[in-house]
Amino acid sequence: MVFMVVPNEQIMGAVQRVFYFHVASAMACYAAFGVVLIASIGFLATRNTKADELSVAAGEVGFVFCTIVLVTGMIWGHSAWNTWFRWQEPRLVTFLVLWLIFLSFTVLRNFGDPRKTAVHGSVLGILGALSVPIVYVSIKFLPQSARLHPEVVERGGLRDPSYWQAFGLSVFAVLSLCGLLVWLRYRIGRLDALARQVSFQEKE
């Protein structure tokens, strides 16, 4: 629908189609990081391994969507600003920091000391999730004339009904995919934990 039904935007042209994947992926990564926050707090409070595995699953999937947001944002930025990255753009910079936090989270959970990664990863996941509101409000305190980041949805930029239909469909599809991937990654984590438990019992 994004490629076949929605017309080109008058100013940006075909590159505006990136917007549908960019915003939907941002919503997906924010939702996944919200799950990381809840699951990490749950693990630190209860030491329940299921909560830890859910945190890992949501963090890894959220990082994938976070990467998509960063890449599509840079594609749009190159068309709008004639440069891939602008350090003067606070939302882009804060989102890069968010991406780096969850890159660290993913590396830690996959290559760190298994005896320590659960606690350290949970703390890092909470820190990353709490950075999401900072990303969102990072441009709100700037005067309107100084805002480089587009606010298409918030400022009513989707006037054609086909834009709204495509936007709603893209958000639903990407959020559904995100939820499915988190569930599948969680199941893989559970099966891996059970396999390690059985292997440990056999060695005894």
What is each of the regions a protein language model found here?
Residues 1-204:
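Polytopic transmembrane helical bundles with strong interfacial aromatic enrichment
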